């Protein structure tokens, strides 16, 4: 069996057009572009590249991006003050924190100063709680992109058995909740799960978010299953691979996302969708 490739790049182009139209409508309603503030602490090259990519995406869709670059030695109080100022700024519609924060800084303190209605990552305790209650408003972008990929490619989630490999607060847990809300029967697997393969072989949908290259092999996958790979692991030679042994699993699965080019492109569009939602909700549009 050769799996159908769930092409995130192609889907992202379709979603870009939808987002651009919605942003154009918002611009006429608020007489300015919807604006995202991206807060980066330190000068990690990968983080800097990502901020630039968000800036380019905003410009291409008609939104605005304000990048706030803070030195790595920024004190906790100063970071919290920056986030509080952005939260109070009426011309900032959404805030994105570049994670993880450098050593010595704690996320909980920063989130306490972040306006939940501007939380574009969906990680504020209020937004996480709403998601857990089945009333999501701003949903974490990466898992939202995985669900959108399945929905747009016509993959039925209702009534299916699903496994999420990984339990992070940004990807694994919210992905499990989104699958549950789509009426899947969900199992969360992690580093303490005995015999991971035995669990996965029973599942129609596998979402991999463990951060371990090649963790999921072909013998772990039920024939015809849908495999969503959130992994972004950079190898010593600079290449990027997912958590799934793509070539081998693609011969068994019914559908699979590649890395790169699968969930990643859709994740960024989900960020823009959250910006649109945040702007509309905050301004009562």
From Swiss-Prot:
Enzyme Commission code: 1.5.1.5, 3.5.4.9
A GO molecular function term, named singly, is: methenyltetrahydrofolate cyclohydrolase activity
The catalysed reaction is:
(6R)-5,10-methylene-5,6,7,8-tetrahydrofolate + NADP(+) = (6R)-5,10-methenyltetrahydrofolate + NADPH; (6R)-5,10-methenyltetrahydrofolate + H2O = (6R)-10-formyltetrahydrofolate + H(+)
What does the entry give for GO biological process? Answer: L-histidine biosynthetic process; methionine biosynthetic process; purine nucleotide biosynthetic process; tetrahydrofolate interconversion
- Which Pfam families does the record cross-reference, listed alphabetically? THF_DHG_CYH, THF_DHG_CYH_C
| Pathway the protein takes part in | One-carbon metabolism; tetrahydrofolate interconversion
Which keywords has UniProt assigned to this entry?
Amino-acid biosynthesis, Histidine biosynthesis, Hydrolase, Methionine biosynthesis, Multifunctional enzyme, NADP, One-carbon metabolism, Oxidoreductase, Purine biosynthesis
Q: What's the superkingdom here?
A: Bacteria
Q: Mind telling me which CDD domains this protein's record contains?
A: NAD_bind_m-THF_DH_Cyclohyd
- One annotated Gene Ontology cellular component of this protein: cytosol
- The residues that the entry says bind NADP(+) are 166-168, 191, 232
User: Which PANTHER family does the annotation name?
Assistant: C-1-TETRAHYDROFOLATE SYNTHASE, CYTOPLASMIC (PTHR48099:SF5), C-1-TETRAHYDROFOLATE SYNTHASE, CYTOPLASMIC-RELATED (PTHR48099)
Subunit structure, as described in the record? Homodimer.
Assigned protein family? Belongs to the tetrahydrofolate dehydrogenase/cyclohydrolase family.
Known function: Catalyzes the oxidation of 5,10-methylenetetrahydrofolate to 5,10-methenyltetrahydrofolate and then the hydrolysis of 5,10-methenyltetrahydrofolate to 10-formyltetrahydrofolate.
Name used for this protein in its record: Bifunctional protein FolD
Organism (species): Chloroflexus aurantiacus (strain ATCC 29366 / DSM 635 / J-10-fl)
């Amino acid at each position: 069996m050769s799996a159908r490739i769930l092409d995130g790049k192609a889907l992202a182009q379709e979603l870009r057009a939808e987002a651009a139209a919605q942003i154009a409508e918002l611009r006429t309603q608020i007489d300015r572009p919807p604006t995202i503030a991206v807060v980066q602490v330190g000068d990690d090259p990968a983080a800097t590249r990502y901020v630039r990519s968000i800036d380019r995406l905003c410009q291409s869709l008609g939104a605005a991006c304000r990048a706030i670059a803070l030195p790595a030695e920024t004190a906790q109080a100063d970071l919290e003050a920056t986030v509080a100022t952005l939260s109070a700024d009426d011309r900032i519609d959404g805030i994105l924190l570049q994670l993880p924060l450098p050593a010595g800084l704690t996320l909980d303190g920063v989130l306490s100063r972040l306006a939940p209605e501007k939380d574009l990552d969906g990680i504020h305790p209020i937004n996480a709680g709403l998601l857990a209650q089945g009333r999501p408003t701003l949903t974490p972008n990466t898992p939202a992109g995985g669900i959108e990929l399945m929905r747009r490619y016509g993959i039925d989630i209702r009534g299916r058995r699903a496994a999420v490999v990984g339990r992070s607060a940004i990807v694994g847990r919210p992905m499990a909740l989104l699958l549950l809300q789509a009426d899947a029967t969900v199992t969360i697997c992690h580093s303490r799960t005995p015999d991971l393969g035995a669990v996965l072989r029973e599942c129609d949908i596998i979402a991999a978010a463990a951060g371990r290259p090649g963790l999921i092999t072909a013998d772990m996958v039920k024939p015809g299953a849908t495999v969503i790979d959130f992994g972004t692991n950079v190898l010593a030679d600079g290449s990027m691979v997912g958590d799934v042994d793509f070539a081998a699993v693609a011969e068994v699965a019914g559908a699979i996302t590649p890395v790169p080019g699968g969930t990643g492109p859709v994740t960024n569009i989900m960020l823009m969708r959250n910006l649109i939602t945040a702007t509309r909700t905050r301004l009562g549009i």
